[in-house]
């Protein structure tokens, strides 16, 4: 029951904050819900296509991450992970290492330049 309350509060908070000034900031990290060491986080990762999706999600096929789903439309990734095995910071670094910018880290420049042309996006 307590977990349900936390999830509802997190989603209400997210809904309220995301309805505000969209022009002010493109990078709003969603709330992280943690219960018993398991967390769900949503944040922005720049990319373009299904090849990007495969690479981004593939970078998170590591111990501790049980789900990673990146949307080509919204550029948001939803990640379910075990906080006793991996941190959100490590998750964001893993994505940057394969060449993709996210809210916290810029993708590796050399790796980015080696991405297929369809995967190269306007960098911030």
Residue ranges and their predicted role:
Residues 20-34:
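Short, low-complexity, disordered segments immediately C-terminal to signal peptides
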Residues 99-111:
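Conserved short beta-strand edge segments in small beta-sheet-based binding/regulatory domains
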Residues 8-13:
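Hydrophobic helical h-region of N-terminal Sec-dependent signal peptides
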Residues 82-88:
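Helix N-cap motif at beta-to-alpha junctions
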């Amino acid at each position: 029951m307590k977990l349900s309350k936390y999830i509802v509060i997190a989603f209400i908070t997210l809904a309220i904050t995301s309805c505000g000034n969209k022009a002010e900031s493109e990078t709003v990290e969603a709330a992280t819900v943690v219960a018993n060491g398991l967390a769900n986080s949503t944040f922005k990762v720049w990319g373009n296509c299904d090849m990007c999706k495969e690479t981004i999600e593939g970078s998170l096929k590591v111990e501790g991450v049980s789900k990673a789903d990146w949307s080509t439309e919204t550029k948001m990734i939803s990640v379910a992970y075990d906080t006793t095995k991996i941190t959100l910071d490590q998750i964001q670094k893993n994505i940057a290492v394969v060449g993709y910018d996210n809210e916290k880290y810029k993708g590796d420049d050399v790796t980015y330049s080696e991405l297929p042309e369809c995967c190269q996006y306007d960098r911030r």
